[in-house]
Amino acid sequence: MKNTKLLLAIATSAALLTGCQNTHGIDTNMAISSGLNAYKAATLSDADAKAIANQGCAEMDSGNQVASKSSKYGKRLAKIAKALGNNINGTPVNYKVYMTSDVNAWAMANGCVRVYSGLMDMMNDNEIEGVLGHELGHVALGHSLAEMKASYAIVAARDAISATSGVASQLSRSQLGDIAEGAINAKYSRDKESEADDFSFDLLKKRGISTQGLVGSFETLASLDGGRTQSMFDSHPPSTERAQHIRDRIASGK
């Protein structure tokens, strides 16, 4: 019933817009497309979104060089993963390193956490713990799930895919790759980024890990501002502000 009402509302809005095409600068086709995207995202179940994340992550892994567990990167990440834990709010977490000079790290709704060797070359283990704690925050707080649904909706609208149960099995490798890329390149709001920062701080404290690494990670990333173009925090709030927020939390003991 909820889905029927939602679709009816979108259809009604679309009909009204069609009658006043391009009025007041509104692009009717874009508005209708946005409405359909919203509907597709709203009707995709959490289970299906995580199933898509499972396959999307596998597709990303197949397209990247993954560091072996015996490599220096694999050994470092194993130590970091042990410190952070392999479960976040009931979601199993798996960690891997991509061998690339890009500076990035991300997590999907299914607990798939990936960090790039370019980032590990720039930071010590404690700083990487802070960064990955932030990415785990997006998973725990539902941000990653919402972005997976939104990314699916865009591809589903483009390729006319229905949001039926078990939709993950209908997707091609190309579609899975597009959805995964859209989800991991999502531009979160300032509030969501701040929430993930605070989650990381709290997680580090809970796990007995130094929170100073979170400050250090922001300071390192701040040095990239205006420099290297492919940085994981290109779309995030200024790193200097975030570092100061964590310093304030450390000073207050809260």
UniProtKB/Swiss-Prot annotation:
Family in the record: Belongs to the peptidase M48B family.
Provide this UniProt record's keywords sorted from A to Z.
Answer: Cell inner membrane, Cell membrane, Hydrolase, Lipoprotein, Membrane, Metal-binding, Metalloprotease, Palmitate, Protease, Signal, Zinc
Q: Which residues form the signal peptide?
A: 1-19
Biological process terms in GO annotation: proteolysis involved in protein catabolic process
Q: Which CDD domains match?
A: M48C_loiP_like
Name recorded for this polypeptide: Metalloprotease YcaL
Residues annotated for lipidation of the kind S-diacylglycerol cysteine are: 20
- What miscellaneous comment appears in this entry? YcaL, BepA and DegP degrade stalled LptD substrate at distinct points in the outer membrane protein assembly.
- Please give the Gene Ontology molecular function terms for this protein: metal ion binding; metalloendopeptidase activity; metallopeptidase activity
**Where does the source fall among the domains of life?**
Bacteria
For bias kind Basic and acidic residues, which ranges apply? 242-254
Function of the protein: Involved in the degradation of the LPS-assembly protein LptD. Degrades LptD that have engaged the Bam complex but are stalled at an early step in the outer membrane protein assembly process.
Species of origin reads Escherichia coli (strain K12)
Query: Catalytic residues?
Result: 135
Membrane-topology descriptor: Lipid-anchor
Going by the record, the broad EC class of this enzyme is: hydrolase
